[in-house]
Amino acid sequence: MKRSMKFIAAFLLLPCVATAQVTDSIQQYGRGISFDMKESTVAGAMATSEQISHKTSIDPSNSLYGLIPGLQVLQNGGYAWDDGATLYIRGVGTSNSSTPLILVDGFEREISSLTVQEIESVTVLKDAASLALYGIRGANGVVYIKTKRGAVHAPVINFGYEFNFSTPNRLPDFVDGYTYAQALNEGMKNDGLSPRYSQRELDAFRDQTYPEFYPNVDWWDEALRDHAYGNNVNFSISGGGERVQYYAQLNYLNNLGIYQPTEENDGYSTQLKYSKMNIRTNLDIKVSNTTKVKLNLLGVFSENNRPQSDISTVFGALYQVPSGAFPIKTSQNIWGGTTVYSNNPIANIAGSGYLRTQGRTLYADMSINQDLSSLLPGLSATVNVGYDSYGFYQEGNVRTFADQSAVKGWDGAEDTYTKLREESDYTFDTSLKTMNSHFNFSAQTNYDRSWGEHKLNATLLYSMDKKIGQGQNNKYAFMDVVAQGHYTYKNRYILDFALSGSASSVLEPGNRWGIFPSIGAGWILSEEDWLKSDNLNLLKLRASYGIAGRADFDANLYKYYFGSGNSYYFKDTPTSQSGMKEYRIAVDGLTYEKSHKLNVGVDLMAWNKLSLTVDGYYDHRTDILVDGSGAISSVFGMTVPMRNDGIINSYGVDVAANWTDHIGDFTYQIGGQFSFARNEIIEMNEEYRPYDYLKRTGHSVGQIFGYEVEGIYQSQEEIDQRDVKQYLSDVRPGDLKFKDQNGDKRIDQYDQVALGYNETCPEIYYGFNVGAEYKGLGFTAYFQGAANYSKILDTKSVYRPLVSNNTISQYYWDNRWSESNPNGTLPRLTTQGSDNNYNTNSSWVADASFLKLRTLEVYYQLPEKWLKNIAFVKGIKIFGRGHDLFCVDGIDIADPESIGVAHPTMRQYAFGFNLKF
């Protein structure tokens, strides 16, 4: 089923478009700056703790699917400690990294270190009015996470427990041993070679008369169980008095993966195991009437366990080894193998030893705020200090497992067993994998004053960031000086302005600083006398323009590097001499990317039920670091350095809406969000291309190029009679037939055109949600989808069978072209590969649009009257949840977000309860 999800998106979003963002009263800019959202000119959007709490995922990024307009969240692998999503803000705006800046309580930190339960809100900053504050690090946007804090009230204790289990999504289906043998013979015949297996060997596969020599092993069934499971326990307490408020949390979670067998070793397991404990304390201390201190501490302790063979090795073997290659073990109790296949999947799991990684992370920060109103009314000063330290240690036993081939002796000959590899002794090893630290210091003065119909808030800030990583050339520093002002007149006319000077250590001395201005304006029409109405809660127009930067390059690109050179011969009698040579040419005039951002938006709230936000934007990105080979002659003689010549334009729209209402005891809510983000390469130093349709310039970043397929050659006669000749490789019946784009009667590299869309980030991204509750019984459902999104189907064995000794999927076997199946839609089988088939072409470029049910929660909150007789208990909630329950798409046999050789994504179920005391 191939159709674009954009039509589904448009249909579903007519009545409801995204979660309301303007209903929350305070918007966080970061930098110690926050304003009432009613009086903000910023294109910011926010998800609250209540919204993200419906999925207590191991990595909080997986709780953000489809929640925040302008934030694209794409799913990655499915195993516990690498389950984080990829985040983009307003799509891709550069040919380099588009990763946004992640801030936790104002400090750059990893979202994966947090738990869902400790997050108060997640705010996405998207336009220049907010991003100019971050100067040289703001161009890709900012995700600002605020953690929970205490308040003045009696202690409130929350305890929650969740049991979860998950099942793999869309595992590939590979053929049995008999079918594989048939496929291999067919492929070799198509290549003009003799068949690999005789008829009696085929019969042995089919009848399983000699399973040791002609096996039929379902490697996926033997290596993986059908579920993973885990626990999540959370305890928190908050409260405080006038002097001290506190929030403290203890969270523990674990997860056991899908490998089997994993317990047959002496004293250790090779299961995919993960556990993590978070301990957080947030304190607000009123030292005096004019002095306040905030102290935040977070300790994260994690451990993961796996076989010595890493996940890519295990799944690489599962995707490659045929069912009929060898038995799991021979009759001599030695792991099976052959000279071709030395990667027994089960031996990789159970026989290679184990590797355990332990992580220790400390996040500590403190801020001191001093009220200076005695000097000047409205004046205050704040100092912030943060220090992070994290290290990862590894230990493990490693060994080489023995394997053995088994060959059947026919016609009275003896069976042959050949030892391919001897088993080694265990070697125990420990090592420090990573040790990093991060120091941040900032000092700022704030002025907040109202007089008459005027309000002014101004900030002057200095900030310094320093990161020290393990190894050479792994130190980075940033420095910022920021001036910001926010002015409001008559509660309806708003002006924001900012000017920041920002520097990065990765740039050349003397060229490290940049200036980043911005201006924003807003008009609250609903405050005008001629528009005031009880039904119109808010109507605001706003616009902003400014510049933000990006300079997260590798260190020392501005330096020349020299290394040892090859020998050179001197004099009449050649004498070899070694020496030094230029290894890397410096980037001349290395500078930061400059993102010129324009945003226009409108916010609407009506009837105390409806909220709507619409933003349109344009981003002109210049000085992008790109390959310089298109601008410098190839006679240069060595690798051409990169240059800041790239230009990319991006534009789009973000829409968010929500409707909340009640009828008696029945409350309901419906909402969603829709984002469209497109980019266009204006300049990339592209090499000369003889035809316009070959040019990458003018297309989006990551646009797929390849051959356009017109069909499949059915016979040698058709090949001979066609006046267009394919010069990619020898053409045989069953090969793909490509379109001649330039009319020169030949198919070569000049016949590639743009196919589909990019495979990095979808242009259309949307989500919608619906929820209802009646007397404590309720449900919430979150859907998320994407469109204008393509993927290249090139997974080995699934779409690239037999070549390089791969197995073959049932899908390919059923749909291949053959003499007996001329209507097959996939190319002929081959063991040698073919540039006519296994290249990038329209047959392998799939529409990756999808719609997923990300979360479905059903819950019951016990009535308060039931709890009156239970001492100290103020609330009980019981729930059941499902995540990624179904996906509507056109690929069917694979998750459109996870194409390739990897751990499968997982469908998750959870049951639990929350207690409030």
Task: Please state what every model-predicted region is.
Residues M1-I279, V293, R689-P690, N742:
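Short, small/polar-rich motifs associated with maturation and membrane association
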Residues T639-N649, Y688-G706, L755-G771, V798-D814, ...:
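C-terminal extracellular loops and terminal segments
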Residues F107-G150, R170-F174, Y214-N234, L253-K294, ...:
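Outer-membrane beta-barrel proteins
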Residues I102, Y487, Q741, A772:
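Short aromatic-centered micro-motifs
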